[in-house]
Amino acid sequence: VTEAAKILDIEHLLDRKPKALSGGQRQRVAMGRAIVRNPKVFLMDEPLSNLDAKLRVAMRTEIKKLHNKLQTTFMYVTHDQTEAMTMGTRIVVMKDGVIQQVDTPANLYTKPDNVFVAGFIGSPQMNFVTATLSKENGSVYASFGDNKIMIPNGKVTPELEGYIGKEVIVGIRPEDIHDDEAFISSRPEAVCNAYVEVTEMMGAETYLYLELAGEQFTARVNQRSTAKIGDTIKVAFETNKIHIFDKDTEMAI
């Protein structure tokens, strides 16, 4: 018990009654009760769900420290993708009881297997738009609304070539949409027109909520962005980071 209390930094709480403990302290006591059993595997089922936002962040750090100290397996169940991404070394993404993808946090973010995983992992979530693929002068393009962007050659696989003339789902993460003039001028093949509906200054960055080809898009741009509500602006996609999915199966192409 003393060793578990030392690991969790709750030695000074051992003589207190439960009613005298804060929410975070009670969570650590609960983990201590598990630690003293010296288990080979810890199973945690949404242990942070009843905590406020500030305490939840603090307890995420505590659990990661505990995992590092004990060097044992933790199975952690959560509906919060932020908890999964920040705490997991390997994540199982499930939908309706069916496993969608098992991978590292980095691969789930950069190489999602389907639309569900792509939209679930990441905040703000990935933007999606239905587009038609075409081929002109040896290059493949995705067209949606009045916009047409070129797909980088590195992403044009034989499988993707099979979708020429068909509709697909194109996904792009908010941080891969840029409104600064230098980037736009360097990517003329990836420029789109967008209407600014809402802006949110987040401090180190700004979120732009855009109407683009009839779809709602979110862009995470530099805090120095001059875009204002009601503006029609040009944005450019970082096309080497786009994701393309089959429209019917929603699986990555």
Show which residues each predicted segment covers.
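ABC ATPase nucleotide-binding domains
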Residues: 1-116, 120
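Residues located in well-ordered beta-strands
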Residues: 104, 130-132, 195-197
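C-terminal boundary and immediately downstream tail of ABC-type ATPase nucleotide-binding domains
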Residues: 111-136, 171, 238
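Structural detector for hydrophobic anchor residues on beta-strands
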Residues: 128-129, 192, 217
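Short, conserved beta-turn/loop elements at beta-strand boundaries and strand-helix junctions
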Residues: 137-139, 199-205
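Short, acidic/hydrophobic/Gly-rich beta-strand patch recurrent on exposed beta strands
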Residues: 141-145, 171, 207-212, 220
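Glycine/charge-rich catalytic "coupling/switch" loops of P-loop NTPases
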Residues: 141-195, 225-253
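A short macromolecule-binding patch
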Residues: 150-151, 217-220
